[in-house]
């Protein structure tokens, strides 16, 4: 998927030399405020998006390893718990909260020119996704406490039930956060904002507009009991959304937002060169 998107990324290579040559000149609007640097904003956004992958995937793997569980069957297994893996995963998950909130905040001043309502909606979606991530962190830390109590000679039956409850809470927080809210926020809302604004190639943004609803459909099927989260169909239906987010992060980190975007031109239209 990433290889197939490389021609899109190269579309606006022409003219980049001129952009770099003029980069030393600062744009000042009629109000005296500096004009938004769309390329720089896009690159920050891209690196933050890559940061969500760098933190979320290892955190998930560490949680599964720390619980002694599997991707589709997350539960508390007494004797197989690794506190070190769970604690390190919790730290990475907190990093995920920081990076995903950053992706929404860093572009707000720019994309609100396209639609302030949708820009605020994206911030709200990222905040809600972060809330589910925080619930997951608390659940995992609680599992560590249960494992410690079990090692100290506590009631094995009662503590196993408690540990399974916390593990189940984490799994459902994961399902509602990355499994549903991400499809709404990153897929539908962000995909539409990128498509309408032209900050990235429209063909790339279309992947988000397709991947978001597909991920939402997968969430509904899991709720209906069609399959478990992490099983074959779940992974397949997650691919379009994951491909959209990863390609968006790589493209923006590499090239930034397109300066010929209509909202970028709106920002710079009253500007004068110094």
Locate predicted features.
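Hydrophobic, aromatic-enriched alpha-helical segments typical of multi-pass transmembrane helices
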Residues: 7-274
């Amino acid at each position: 998927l990433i290889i197939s998107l490389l021609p899109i990324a190269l579309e606006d290579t022409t003219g980049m030399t001129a952009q770099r040559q003029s980069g030393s000149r600062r744009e000042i609007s009629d109000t005296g405020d500096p004009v938004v640097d769309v390329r720089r904003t896009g690159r920050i956004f891209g690196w933050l998006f890559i940061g969500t992958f760098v933190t979320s995937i290892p955190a998930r793997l560490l949680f599964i390893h720390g619980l002694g569980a599997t991707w589709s069957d997350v539960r508390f297994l007494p004797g197989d718990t690794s506190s070190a893996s769970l604690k390190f995963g919790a730290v990475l998950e907190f990093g995920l909260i920081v990076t995903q909130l950053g992706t929404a905040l860093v572009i707000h001043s720019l994309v609100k020119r396209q639609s302030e309502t949708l820009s605020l909606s994206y911030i709200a979606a990222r905040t809600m996704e972060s809330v589910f991530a925080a619930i997951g962190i608390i659940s995992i830390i609680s599992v560590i406490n249960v494992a410690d109590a079990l090692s100290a000679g506590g009631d094995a039956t009662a503590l196993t039930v408690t540990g399974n409850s916390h593990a189940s809470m984490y799994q459902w927080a994961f399902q509602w956060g990355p499994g549903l809210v991400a499809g709404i926020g990153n897929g539908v809302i962000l995909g539409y904002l990128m498509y309408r604004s032209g900050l990235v190639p429209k063909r790339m943004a279309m992947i988000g507009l397709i991947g978001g609803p597909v991920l939402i459909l997968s969430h509904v099927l899991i709720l209906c009991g069609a399959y478990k989260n992490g099983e074959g169909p779940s992974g397949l239906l997650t691919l379009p959304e994951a491909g959209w987010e990863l390609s968006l992060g790589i493209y923006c980190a590499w090239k930034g937002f397109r300066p010929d975007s209509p909202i970028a031109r709106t920002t710079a239209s009253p500007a004068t060169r110094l």
